[in-house]
Amino acid sequence: TLEVTLFPYTTLFRSLGEIVDTIYECARAVRAVPDSAEGPSTALEMPQDGLRYRLMSTFLSYLPKEKAIFDLKMNVDPRGSFTELVHTLNCGQVSINISKPGITKGEHWHNSKWEQFIVVSGHGLIQMRKEGTDEVLNYEVSGDKIQSVIMLPGYTHNIINLSETEDLVTVMYCNEVFNPERPDTYFDKVEK
């Protein structure tokens, strides 16, 4: 057992094996930074007072300059785009959605997946309806007032760009990384 001091915060007692495993984990994460539009980076779980947190900062300080910038895969269609920004190991993903003027996106619901929509630019309407009911919840949102709207499990939902001229830019958090083998996404229009 070794004593590791994370000055000035804490002293941890770790086995050499744990320290080596943590070093390899951080090194793998740095090597996993994409060279091109391969998709989002994966964020490691890192308590801020832990060894992994400090090691990752050290590894990143040696990241080659050309790897400090990398493309993300934009999924583009006539409605706009959807880009996954960051995946986490056990806390989901963060994405950015751009909707063209007048466009409605979504019209689906999830059993256990939940999302948060945060409009950062533009003017939109988020609608939700609990499956099996007729009541539609309407949330008017704008980049002028940053708010978070939770897409509740069991509620079909959409987001509508109300502008005729501006794109609607929405940051989206989802509690799980998308898995095409188990998408937990079911089509149903909010307004029947």
Give the location of each predicted region.
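A short glycine-rich, His/Asp/Glu-containing loop-to-beta-strand
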Residues: 68, 72-107
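Short beta-strand His + acidic residue motifs that chelate non-heme Fe in jelly-roll/DSBH
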Residues: 82, 106-108, 126-128, 149-151, ...
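A short beta-loop-beta micro-motif enriched in histidine and acidic residues
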Residues: 91, 103-116, 143-145
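Short acidic-glycine-tyrosine-enriched beta hairpin
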Residues: 130-155
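Double-stranded beta-helix
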Residues: 133-135, 162-192
